[in-house]
Regions:
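Bacterial N-terminal signal peptides
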Residues: 3-12
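Hydrophobic membrane-targeting alpha-helices
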Residues: 13-17
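Repetitive, compositionally biased segments used for assembly/scaffolding
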Residues: 18-116
Length: 116
C-alpha cells in the first residue's frame, strides 16, 4: 500500500527541473557552430549577433584553425557541422533578439570578454 501511494505521489508531483541561469558568453570557447536557420533555435545554446563595430561587442572572437588552441574565452574554432561542436549558436540579424554580440578580431591577444 505504501509503495502504491508513493508511486502516485511521484507520478503527480514530479521533481522540479533546476532553474537555468543567464547565458554567460565569457565561458564559451572551443569548437563553435554558427547556425543560421531560425527553425533550429531550440537546438542552440544561445543566440548571437555579429557586431560590425568592435566597440559595441560583448565578446571579441579570434578564429583558431585548430580546436586544441581554442582553450580560452574568445578563442573559437569553427566546427564543420553542429554535431562536432562544443557549442551551437544561432546567428540573428536583429541585435535586440540576441543574447550577446560578438566581433571578430585579427589579433589573438585582444580576444575575450570586455571588462567594464
Amino acid at each position: 500500500m505504501l509503495s502504491f501511494v508513493l508511486t502516485l505521489l511521484l507520478a503527480f508531483l514530479p521533481a522540479k527541473s533546476p532553474a537555468l541561469g543567464p547565458l554567460e558568453p565569457c565561458k564559451i570557447f572551443g569548437s563553435v557552430y554558427l547556425e543560421t536557420d531560425p527553425g533550429r533555435r531550440s537546438y542552440c545554446y544561445g543566440t548571437v549577433y555579429i557586431e560590425p563595430e568592435e566597440a559595441f561587442a560583448d565578446v571579441l572572437i579570434f578564429r583558431e584553425n585548430n580546436k586544441l588552441f581554442a582553450d580560452k574565452p574568445g578563442l573559437w574554432a569553427e566546427a564543420p557541422a553542429r554535431d562536432f561542436a562544443d557549442y551551437v549558436l544561432l546567428v540573428v540579424t536583429d541585435r535586440s533578439r540576441a543574447d550577446f554580440s560578438i566581433h571578430y578580431t585579427t589579433v589573438r591577444s585582444f580576444a575575450g570578454c570586455k571588462t567594464n
